[in-house]
Amino acid sequence: MDLSITVNGIKFPNPFLLGSGPPGTNARVLAKSYDAGWGGAVAKTVSLESSKVVNVVPRYGKLRSRNNGEVIGFENIELISDRPIEVWLDEFRQVKKEYPNHVLVASIMEEYDKERWQELTRVVQDTGVDAFELNFSCPHGMTERKMGSEMGEHPDLTEEVTSWVKEVAKIPVWAKMTPNITNIKEPSLAAVRGGADGISAINTILSVIGVNLDTLRPMPTVEGYTVPGGYSSQAVKPIALRMVSQLALALPKETSISGIGGIETSHDAIEFMLLGSSTVQICTGVMLKGVKMVDELQEGLAKFMTDKGFNSVQEIVGKSLPYFSTHMDLVKMMKEAKRHKAGEAARDNEWAQKDITEKTAELTSN
């Protein structure tokens, strides 16, 4: 089955992309992902001065289910790429030469300086990459240099920096947005005003993964200390779905969305597509499951399309958006459907502590 989709004029063999991070940290791992069947990849974020980037060890932390030990949450305090830009430029050229039909998106980040943003845009663009993703959303480390989410949390900066890039970019530009904000629509719309062709959402959620009760130190612990980091994996998916749906309902129709956040299965990916994502990105899932997880993604999407009668991936995008409403309308529709008696169980005076779990199950839809 044809799983291709064209987004911002770029044809993706399928809608599944490696998300920016360790899975796209050099040409070798990018090549492995393409060989495995991924439709595209967003490389690890690059900047002009890698010497300022110093990563620490350990830099990851896991939140596990108390029932079976499964990883349901993942924190990282990893920074952007620490490899020289000159090395990246050579590898971008190499990857595009060897995989001309696979999409390569360059993630870029710089300090608040027009000349630096435009220089980075020019030199990376000359390598033949297919699109840019502007990292306005890394929540840790880089913010100390007024980078990452320090820009994405301020719509005026988001719009201005996007416009700087668009002045020199000849390829599509996506802006990657932070969830660490009250209203994700505001900076996203600002990026569109600045000329962004698409929005990627969401990046990780600022977090502390836990505290070691033996040492009393928060984790991940580096020489006895830590910093808050970015939270990802399964547990963030509902938050990401909410924000993606909000963006899909608010952005101009021509603005594409690349959905990110807790995607590990084809079921997850399809949910994002139904809520407006043309492509989906997976980073933590690949770190935990490996690049071969793309097999299930493709097989599951193809089966879903066959079962539901979809003729193209594009037909899926945004299909579930019309079913969002307001709470007042939900009450009205329930009453019109003569189901209001079923709702009586939700009244406060119907609840009793002895059967709270039973009442909870009674009012749950899945």
Regions found by a protein language model. Give the residues of each.
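C-terminal extensions of enzymes
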Residues: M273, M287-N366
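Short secondary-structure boundary segments
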Residues: K44-V46, F136, N203, T284-G285
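Electropositive phosphate-/nucleotide-binding environments in soluble metabolic enzymes
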Residues: A27, D82-L89, K114, P155, ...
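C-terminal helical cap(s) of enzyme catalytic domains, especially alpha/beta-barrels
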Residues: S50-N67, V208-P228, V286-F310
